[in-house]
Every structure is written in structure tokens, then in C-alpha cells.
Amino acid sequence: MTCGLLSVTVTFRRPAKWTGYLRHLCCRGAVMDLGPMRKSYRGDREAFEETHLTSLDPMKQFASWFDEAVQCPDIGEANAMCVATCTRDGKPSARMLLLKGFGKDGFRFFTNYESRKGKELDSNPFASLVFYWEPLNRQVRVEGPVKKLPEKEAENYFHSRPKSSQIGAVVSRQSSVIPDREYLRKKNEELGQLYQDQEVPKPEYWGGYILYPQVMEFWQGQTNRLHDRIVFRRGLATGDSPLGPMTHHGEEDWVYERLAP
């Protein structure tokens, strides 16, 4: 007997006990309607106004929000971020990484140069970062050019990591195809014994990047979906072009505006 039903829409309204049933439906080609899955954010009295900016330097504003995220007990890794890269012909990719430092010069992270993101940054050295702190209903988006960190800085950070993490970086030629997980286990054990009493050399294919911010957007959620968005961008260094009536001077070469949600 052949069933003529090709697809069905399922509205997700019930709690987690329905997970198994929903998974069953999904495997049968059902279309999962997740529209009702929404939560309340902040109210209008908690809106993020321009007067609430800690600083007109977006790096200082980021530091303020980042500190609140670090202090929030419901946020496990405040430095977790999505890093989006793109090939020269416009094919994007994204993944979660940990931010390992930030300052006036930009945002630092470390990875394998032979990974997909490493190859994309080589051919198209621009990236976007997104930090999402859900318990605070806040998000920060950063855009800008990326360059490799000096080898000495990468070396110093590499050897500050736990030895098991150093060995893991040597074990994994990130994004290469491997036969199975046992392959990693065996190689990890072999290298663990090899470097038991000696320093782990940093692989040439491992290092760091720094993203120099040209755009930084601060987003705070509102229950009525009239979210707050204040975006900073680098202004013209010469100052030849006058600012529009809704564009404001920030610190140094930054200008800022409010965007519609």
C-alpha cells in the first residue's frame, strides 16, 4: 500500500515529552512548524536607549556588556562567539569559537590555518563575529578585516594552554577526513606518551587571528519585537562628508546610529 501523503505541518506547542514523537514525524518527512516557539524578552521600560551607552567608543561598550555576561550565572561561556567567513565567490560558512582576547586593536581568536575558516580567511580576509547572551537578551555583531597574529604571540598562547589541548592541536589536522574516532584516540595516546616529559611544539598550521572592527552593532531584545539596535561604524577619516541628521559622532573615528529592528 502506498501512502499519498508527501508532507504534513506539525505545530510545536507541547513540552519536551513530545520530543520523541516529533522526531518520528520529522523522519517521515513532516514539516516542523516552530512558529509558536517564542519567549518574552524585555519590556519597554528596559529599552536600550542611547543615553544608556557606557561609552561612545564601541570597544568600551562591548567591554561593559561582556563584563555583565561574565558575571551572569546563567551564561556558561561569555566568550563563545559565532565566526562567519566567506569564500571569494560568496559561499559563507560559520562556526562557534572562543574569543581569546580583545582590546583597542581588535578581537583575537586561535585556530588551525588549514581548516575551512583558515583557508577562507587566506583568500578573503574579512569576517563577522556574533556574541549572543540569551539570558540577558543581548547580542553583539562585529564586522571587519582579519589578519594573522605574529608567530611569537601564537607561540606564547599555544604553550599557555593545558598540555592535553596542545597535543589535541597536533593530533587533529582540522577539517581533514579521518577513518573513525579510534584513529584520534590512538594518535592522541601516542603523542601523549611522546611528549610526556617534553614540550609540545606548536604546529606550523596552528595560530591566531585578529579582527579589526569596522562595524559593531549592539542589539537588545524586546518582547514586542521592537528590538533595540545601535550600530557603530568607522566614519570617514577626513571628515569631508557631513553626517546625516540621525548619525552621531562617537569617540575617535566612530559614528553611531539607531537602526529599525
Curated annotation (Swiss-Prot):
Record InterPro entries: Pyridox_Oxase (IPR000659), Pyridox_Oxase_CS (IPR019740), Pyridox_Oxase_N (IPR011576), Pyridoxamine_oxidase_dimer_C (IPR019576), Split_barrel_FMN-bd (IPR012349)
UniProt pathway annotation: Cofactor metabolism; pyridoxal 5'-phosphate salvage; pyridoxal 5'-phosphate from pyridoxamine 5'-phosphate: step 1/1; Cofactor metabolism; pyridoxal 5'-phosphate salvage; pyridoxal 5'-phosphate from pyridoxine 5'-phosphate: step 1/1
Binding annotation for pyridoxal 5'-phosphate: 42-45, 100, 157, 161, 165, 225-227
GO process terms (BP): pyridoxal phosphate metabolic process; pyridoxamine metabolic process; pyridoxine biosynthetic process
The record's free-text note on cofactor binding: Binds 1 FMN per subunit.
PTM-bearing positions, type Phosphothreonine: 238
Keyword flag Flavoprotein: yes
Molecular-function GO terms, alphabetical: FMN binding; protein homodimerization activity; pyridoxal phosphate binding; pyridoxamine phosphate oxidase activity
Entry binding sites for FMN: 95-98, 110-111, 116-117, 139, 174-175, 219, 229
Modified residues (Phosphoserine): 241
Top EC class for this record: oxidoreductase
Catalyzed chemical reaction(s): pyridoxamine 5'-phosphate + O2 + H2O = pyridoxal 5'-phosphate + H2O2 + NH4(+); pyridoxine 5'-phosphate + O2 = pyridoxal 5'-phosphate + H2O2
Cofactor section: FMN
GO cellular component: cytosol
EC number: 1.4.3.5
Keywords attached to this entry: Flavoprotein, FMN, Oxidoreductase, Phosphoprotein, Pyridoxal phosphate, Pyridoxine biosynthesis
Transmembrane segments: none
Family per similarity comment: Belongs to the pyridoxamine 5'-phosphate oxidase family.
Subunit and interaction comment: Homodimer.
Functional description taken from the UniProt entry: Catalyzes the oxidation of either pyridoxine 5'-phosphate (PNP) or pyridoxamine 5'-phosphate (PMP) into pyridoxal 5'-phosphate (PLP).
Protein name: Pyridoxine-5'-phosphate oxidase
Organism for this UniProt entry: Mus musculus (Mouse)
